[in-house]
């Protein structure tokens, strides 16, 4: 069963791919819809912001009204050389004295030089140029036509903007009564629905949905296991979130989706479905333990990617405020 519908410009995000994922739980025969079935974006052929278009002054004010006592939760992980990293990535910080002591007050300065990948390190925000389906980025932009040594000329992470939205925590690990889901557990639509019911929350248009798997407990404790695989959402859960018109999907693992994917013929299909097809942003490696401990399930979620011109993503330090 292969399902797809054409994305009509100006239509709702749901109309873009309401039936792109088959109803079978395994999705063994699922294929990404071809360019003519997924483009142009519902936000227009020239759109570079994807689901960020769902954020409005009204939605920002609604998110601000969720703040009751002003307690802040830092959702970003510490950045240093001990963190888990994908092959080929590294993090080195070199401290240096840059000036001084100067003047009668003996003023001096210190700076650091950091050698790392700014876009995909630590707690990270995936922009719309991070992944591609064949030759195409989001909105069927041909990667080769916009890729330069100094970055992408379209769909750079600087186009995403800043986010101040309603955030929802769906604690799947707690739902299952475990500290951490199994390595290869694929989160399903019934899991999301049960977590919503347990938390007594609904998912609304423009939300940031944060999914706790417990996998973050391995961070700097067992980096090899953390990187090898992970529990996460599958395609049908991703479709469920798109149907609710979410803006951001985040998790405490490194790819949001289950890895490796059960269908060995698919590689990072949730990335493709959310980023490339629907323009929904991902935030990976979140620290969700304090939110889970305090049972905070609805909050204001704030994240701002670096203005890295032409970048594919950004290290970020999101916060939740209740």
Task: Describe these PLM feature segments.
Residues 10-20:
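Bacterial N-terminal signal peptides
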Residues 22-24:
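Long, low-complexity intrinsically disordered regions enriched in Ser/Thr/Asp/Glu with frequent Gly/Pro
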Residues 26-322:
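Active-/binding-site microenvironments in catalytic and ligand-binding cores
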């Amino acid at each position: 069963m292969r399902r797809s519908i054409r994305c009509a410009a100006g239509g709702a995000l749901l109309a873009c791919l309401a039936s792109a994922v088959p109803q079978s739980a395994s999705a063994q025969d699922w294929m990404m819809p071809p360019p003519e079935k997924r483009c142009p974006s519902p936000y227009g052929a020239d759109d570079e912001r994807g689901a960020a278009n769902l954020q409005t002054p009204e939605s920002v004010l609604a998110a601000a009204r969720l703040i009751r006592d002003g307690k802040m939760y830092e959702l970003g992980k510490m950045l240093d050389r001990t963190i888990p990293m994908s092959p080929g990535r590294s993090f080195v910080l070199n401290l240096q004295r840059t000036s001084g002591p100067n003047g009668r007050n003996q003023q001096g300065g210190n700076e650091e030089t950091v050698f790392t990948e700014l876009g995909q390190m630590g707690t990270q925000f995936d922009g719309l140029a991070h992944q591609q389906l064949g030759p195409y980025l989001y909105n069927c932009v041909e990667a080769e036509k916009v890729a330069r040594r100094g970055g992408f000329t379209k769909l750079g992470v600087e186009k995403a903007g800043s986010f101040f939205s309603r955030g929802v925590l769906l604690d799947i690990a707690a739902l299952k009564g475990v500290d951490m889901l199994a390595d290869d557990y694929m989160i399903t639509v019934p899991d999301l629905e049960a977590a919503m019911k347990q938390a007594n929350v609904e998912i609304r248009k423009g939300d940031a949905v944060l999914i706790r798997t417990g996998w973050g407990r391995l961070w700097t404790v067992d980096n090899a296991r953390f990187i090898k695989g992970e529990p996460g959402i599958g395609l049908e859960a991703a479709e469920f979130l798109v149907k609710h018109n979410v803006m951001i999907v985040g998790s405490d693992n490194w790819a949001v989706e289950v890895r490796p994917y059960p269908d060995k013929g698919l590689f990072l299909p949730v990335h493709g479905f959310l980023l490339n097809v629907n323009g929904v942003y991902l935030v990976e490696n979140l620290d969700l333990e304090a939110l889970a401990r305090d049972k905070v399930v609805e909050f204001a979620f704030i994240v701002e990617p670096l203005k890295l011109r032409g970048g594919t993503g950004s290290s970020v330090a999101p916060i939740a405020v209740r």
